[in-house]
Amino acid sequence: HFIVIFRDVRGAIASMFSRADKNFKAPSTISFLRCWRKQVAFSAMMSESNLFNKRISFIKYENLVSDPEKEIAQLCSDLNIKYSSDMIDTKNFVGLGTNIKQWVPNSGYVDVPRTGIFNGSIERWRETLDETMISFIEFIAGPELKYLGYDLVNRDNYSKPKKRFYNIILEENNNSLGWRTDNNDAALDFSFEILRHFCLANNLDDLNIIKRFFLFPKIPFL
């Protein structure tokens, strides 16, 4: 059984920007967004495949931390196992793999309590990200955010390219020290995103172009 957890990518990026670890090398924002989009694309494909029928569960991070009992109880139902309140007691959490020590929070924010399920960061991106960055994120990942049911700040014009978006890509292209999946060419990457919106607006049916921009021959949010 596969369990996929989605998080509003605006919140994920805000958390990344807020990391107190000065040694952390953040990826370029466009690279982060493109990797997040791939997760959505693969999940959409899996949800429609008979191969994964009744073998995949989707959870929104925001719902999970807001009402963990409800979300985990539903997951237990999907897995046909009995729910226990111990499942959401963080004192019982351990690390991944060989790390069997007690789990500790790894949020980018410094005010996260050491125990309990913290939900204070869900909407914090609205305060910590400036208007330009929010618009840029929605320009790159707006269709996927809408597909997952997240409301957009710029719902009426999120697909409109702006020069300051290019400037973000260019600046990070020159200064980012973290991992990246871009083309190392700001103009090319910006053009790619403009063409992606053109494909959506015009319902192009060229399978090669669709796969180029959306990973699979079917666009899930059309």
Which residues does each predicted region cover?
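PAPS-dependent sulfotransferases, especially Golgi type II membrane carbohydrate sulfotransferases
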Residues: I81-L222
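PAPS-dependent sulfotransferase catalytic domain
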Residues: H1-D89, F93-V112
